[in-house]
A protein has these predicted regions:
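Active-site-adjacent loops and short helices of periplasmic peptidoglycan-processing enzymes
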Residues: 1-160, 164, 169-173
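Domain-terminus/edge residues, biased toward the C-terminal soluble/receptor-binding domains
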Residues: 140, 154-156, 160-161, 166-385
């Protein structure tokens, strides 16, 4: 249910969601195909974290020579040693395509247990992992052919999918910390090889490309990340995150322009914070209502409580929070309708058995739906009870 007063968005594709529940607060062409450019690196980082530990040391290979001259680069050199965490910084802060290749190679070789794998094979293995990860996260219109997002006609995504990836990304403490950083200055290997004259390491000074995070006229006070992108084909792109009070939001803009990607992202986030409220419709284990029984052991009473197993949290327009209506629908396998129209639940029942669906609506529009469960064991009735 969308609140009024949505901002004007000139980007071709956009989405605003709650970071924790995935509730969509605004959308524009959210499932249409776009080219993601360097925003790709969100899912690249997710795949890396599935296989590598942040403190692992990796060694830079010839994969850094496989990026185009006009790519954004972190500045790695052949045989350099650095931690996975700092390679991720190189990927996410200066948006290094060289970092993407280094991480893809290390991940693929570990996944396949083959340290001698060529980079061509590494890229094929890694992009297969990216596509599997996208499917696992519920993507509907994504396909990846490289780890960095440099344009390829067969490398695409959509705002909806990227929001799913961003939600998973922000759940990872290491990644969430990295993309909140305005800059990074330090040794790529965290000084671990200071006493080894043979080891190659580098000191870096990287500055985030995300103007919502850094100190400038477009800085957004509540911004916490995430990733920028640009190619001629993709336009100016930004997937942003922000936190204010008890709300955490993610905005996604594709095929936009500068400086509109900064101002429109801020406007979208403000729209979410100012016009929606976080509402817990019910707590985990809470009883919804008592429903009448039939064909049951009357010694156990004539009703059974309907309960939720999980909390139901959503975001609603602030002016509609008090207009929520609830409807309980008993599942057909348990439903008995009496002659007077009364709906009852037939025994036997096992505690925790799903027996109903609860639908929440505002002005007839569905805003949430949850399964409901029997809150007690109920025996079948006999001639003795």
């Amino acid at each position: 249910l969308q609140a009024d007063r949505a901002p004007t968005i000139t980007a071709e594709s956009a989405l605003l969601i709650d970071q924790e529940s995935g509730t969509i607060l605004y959308e524009k062409n959210a499932k249409e195909k776009i080219y993601p450019a360097s925003v790709t690196k969100i899912i690249t980082a997710l795949v890396v974290m599935d296989y590598l530990q942040p403190d692992e040391i990796i060694t830079v290979g010839t994969e850094i020579n496989e990026v185009t001259l006009d790519s954004s680069k972190a500045g790695h050199v052949l045989n350099e040693k650095l931690t996975v965490e700092n390679a991720l910084r190189g990927l996410l802060i200066p948006s290094g395509n060289d970092s993407a290749n280094v991480l893809a190679a290390a991940t693929a070789r570990k996944a396949e247990n083959d340290e001698d794998m060529s980079f061509a094979k590494c890229e094929a293995v890694f992009t297969d992992l990216m596509n599997k990860k996208a499917e696992e996260l519920g993507a509907v219109n994504s396909h990846f052919t490289n780890a960095h997002g440099y344009h390829d006609e067969n490398h695409y995504s959509c705002a909806y999918d990227m929001a799913l990836f961003a939600m998973a990304f922000m759940q990872n403490e290491t990644l969430a910390e990295i993309i909140s950083e305005k800059s990074f200055s330090g040794n790529g290997a965290d000084g671990q090889f200071a006493d080894d004259p043979e080891a190659i390491t580098q000191d870096y000074n990287w500055v985030s490309h995300n103007y919502l995070v850094t100190d400038n006229e477009y800085q957004y006070a509540y911004a916490t990340g995430i990733k920028t992108g640009f190619t001629d084909e993709a336009g100016e792109c930004l997937t942003a995150s922000a936190e204010k009070g008890d709300m955490k939001l993610i905005s996604v803009l594709f095929k936009g322009s500068d400086p509109a990607r900064w101002t429109e992202s801020a406007s979208l986030l403000d729209y979410g914070f100012n016009n929606y409220a976080r509402v817990e419709l019910t707590a985990a284990g809470a009883a919804i209502e008592e429903v009448p029984l039939t064909k049951h052991n009357k010694l156990q009473g004539d009703t059974v409580p309907l309960v939720y197993q999980n909390a139901l949290v959503t975001y609603l327009p602030t002016d509609a929070v008090n207009s929520v209506e609830t409807a309980v629908t008993i599942l057909d396998d348990y439903k008995v309708e009496e002659k007077d129209g009364t709906v009852k639940v037939k025994a036997p029942l096992t505690k925790g058995e799903e027996i109903a669906t609860v639908t929440y609506t505002i002005d007839g529009k569905e805003v949430a739906q949850m399964p409901a469960y029997a809150g007690a064991d109920i025996e079948k009735g006999t001639i003795f009870n």
